[in-house]
Structures are given as structure tokens and as C-alpha cells.
Amino acid sequence: MKTIQSIALLSAIVAAPSVLADVEIQVPSSVDILAVNEAKPDLDGGLFSSHKTLTLPDGQNQIVFQYQLAFDKGNDREFVDSDAVIATFDATDTTLTFDLPKYRNTAEAKSGFKNLEWSLVDENQNEISVKQDKLVKDGMQIGRKYPQEAKEYNQQGGIAALAIGTTAGATAAVVQPVTLPAKIDGNAANTAEEMLYFWYEKADAETKQKFKDYVNK
């Protein structure tokens, strides 16, 4: 019976990661996410959607973004971009949205972008704590490699640097390895045991540790 329960627990964790808690950021079309936790961003949403969704793990995360606006000027459109902002924050199991200033024209935007005032707010419209800085690079701006720039920024210990040991949005957990037979003895293993080994091998280190804790109860 314990084996069957173990299979159910392990397979549920491995096969359905979407049930785990995470943080979602609703990203408006005026915000360009340039890097996430020293990596290229992966957002959900169509090319012409009014907003996209960025899903992050619970805990400390870092984003790099630009606020981009366009204004009518006669028959033309004039575009204004903010400096790249690098920001680090802690959040758990919530949905966040950007709270950004609005400007009536190009002049207002250029002036406001010199010291951009923005925030992230949760589902209750409470502003969360954010450490932020400008990710500045001299010279040519085209072709910038923002994930690499964020990594170098963190190594230098900037105001909005990720905590030491934090990469890809999650702090690596130190776990003790679980010792299991490398190969199942076909004469001894029943179907339940085979399923148990199958799901165990598919699990990541964190899930294996959770499973070990459960089995040892």
C-alpha cells in the first residue's frame, strides 16, 4: 500500500508541475522584457496581445526591461524608450502587474524617463518591495546581450544584484542523494515497483528529496 501511495505522490509531482505555486507578471505591450534571471525571457501571449504573461518561480527573481511609448507627431509616430531597468524582488504565489506613469507627449516621456517611477503591485494593489537600477552600457545600443549584462552586473554586486547562489530564479537546494538500485531485477520487481522507479528517474533533485522525506516518514 505504501508503494502505491508513493507512486501516486511522485507521479503527481512530476507529471503535473503546473499545480505548484509560482509568480505571474502581467506584462503590457509597452514593456519589453529583455532578460529574466540572467537568461532570455519566455513569455506567454500572442504577438499582438495587449499583454503577455511572464511566469517565474516563487522567491527572488530579477528582470531587465524597457518602457517603450509611441506618440503621434503629425502624420508620423515618434518612439521613446526608457533606459534598461534591472530590478530584483521577492514574491510568492501571486500575480503582479506593472504600475507605470502615463505621459501626454514625447517631451513629457523623455523628461519622465530620466528618473522613471514605476512599481510592481500584487492582486490587492499592494506595491511590493523592489530593488532597481539602470543597466547602462556606453556606445552602440543595438545588439546588446542583456542576459550577459545582467550576469556581469550581479557579479559586480550592484544595487539590484541577485543574492549570491541564486540563478535562474531559484536558489539551489543542497540535498542528500537517494540510493536506489541502478537496475531493477526483473524477477523480483513487480509492476508497482517498476512504476515507482520510472517516476523517480524522471524527477528533479528537489522532487527526489521531497519523495525521500515522504518515504522516510
Swiss-Prot record:
The keyword Signal applies. The keyword Signal applies. Residues 1-21 form the signal peptide. Keywords: Signal. InterPro entries: UPF0319. Belongs to the UPF0319 family. This is UPF0319 protein VS_II0881. It comes from Vibrio atlanticus (strain LGP32) (Vibrio splendidus (strain Mel32)). The lineage of its organism: Bacteria, Pseudomonadati, Pseudomonadota, Gammaproteobacteria, Vibrionales.
